[in-house]
Each structure stands twice: as structure tokens, then as C-alpha cells.
Design a protein with these regions (language model features):
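Nucleotide/pyrophosphate-binding catalytic subdomain
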Residues: 1-178
Length: 178
């Protein structure tokens, strides 16, 4: 099973380079980091949220939405796929707005981060779908399990991965968030 892992992706041009590399290398799993700008905004949300600056948090969430929609418009020209990713963006942004309404705590902060990491991965997934590849975002939450000692349960993880692969034989490439 071929796996490609990518480092920091700063902008749209680097995103295009990663997509081209994935098309050339054709890995079974491509591990992509969150886009650098989204990472910066996640930090800004955490800081403003923990300081109870709700307006700043919501404004930052809106900036994430605008940025993702702009990327979608530039990179995903197929109208059907563009609409699908925009629906995903709006769904994610709505969830995040609801989450930042709650009182700040670490669990909710992790949920916000998970949403944005997933959204970043989904942008790559849809870009590759536009190129004709059957691509799916890898739901890593289904695969990871810790044992009673709070360590990864390797036998469970191996079994889960094999089952996941068997269930998704029609997928060319999985995109995994880093």
C-alpha cells in the first residue's frame, strides 16, 4: 500500500503542487496537513474563544468560510462538485459557529479543530475527484482505538483498517488529515 505524506501547505499554488504530485504518484493514501492559513485561524479562534471574545471568534469562522469558498471556486470548476464542497463548507461552518457559542473548554476546542481539519482534507478530496479519481476522505476516527493503558490498540487498528479497505474497494485514493 503506497502512502504519501506531505508537509506544510501554505497557499493555493502549493495545494496545486500537492494535487499534481498525488496524481503522478497515485498513492493509496495521501496524508495532507491542514492548510497553513486554516491553522493560523484555528489558533486565533482558540485564543479569542478562551478570552470570551465571541465576535472575534465568529469573524474568524467567517474568514475560514470565505477562504474555503474562494479555494473551491479557483480549484473545483465542475459545477456539481463545486456545489457539493460548498455545501460541506457551509455545514462545517454552521457547526463551528454553534460550537463557539458554548463556554470554552478543551473538548469543544478539539471538536472545532477536527471540523476544520476535515474540511481542509475535503478540499483535496474534491480537487482530486474533479481530476477523475475516486477519492474519499479517510475517517481516521473509525480506525483509532486506545486500550486500557491509553495506548493504541494495534490489533484493533489493523483489523479496522483491513475492514475499512475491504468496504471501500471502489476508492482509488484516501485523503487522511494530518
Amino acid at each position: 500500500m503506497k502512502v504519501c505524506k506531505f508537509e506544510k501547505i501554505k497557499d493555493e499554488d502549493e495545494m496545486k503542487q500537492v494535487i499534481n504530485c498525488i496524481q503522478k504518484e497515485h498513492p493509496y493514501v495521501a496524508v495532507v496537513p491542514i492548510l497553513a492559513q486554516l491553522q493560523e485561524w484555528l489558533q486565533a479562534i482558540s485564543i479569542s474563544w478562551f478570552h470570551e471574545e465571541d465576535e472575534v471568534s465568529h469573524a474568524t469562522v467567517n474568514a475560514i468560510e470565505a477562504y474555503c469558498c474562494t479555494l473551491a471556486n479557483h480549484l473545483i470548476t465542475d459545477s456539481h462538485l463545486n456545489q457539493e464542497i460548498k455545501n460541506r463548507i457551509l455545514e462545517c461552518i454552521k457547526k463551528i459557529h454553534i460550537l463557539v457559542e458554548d463556554k470554552a473548554d478543551l473538548l469543544i476546542d478539539k471538536m472545532i479543530k477536527a471540523e476544520v481539519y476535515g474540511l481542509s482534507s475535503d478540499l483535496f478530496t474534491y480537487c482530486l475527484r474533479q481530476q477523475g479519481l475516486r477519492t474519499q476522505t479517510l475517517d481516521t476516527g473509525k480506525l483509532i482505538q486506545i486500550n486500557l493503558e491509553r495506548k493504541p490498540d494495534i490489533p484493533y487498528i489493523q483489523e479496522s483498517i483491513q475492514q475499512y479497505i475491504d468496504e471501500n474497494r471502489n476508492v482509488d485514493i484516501f485523503i487522511a488529515p494530518l
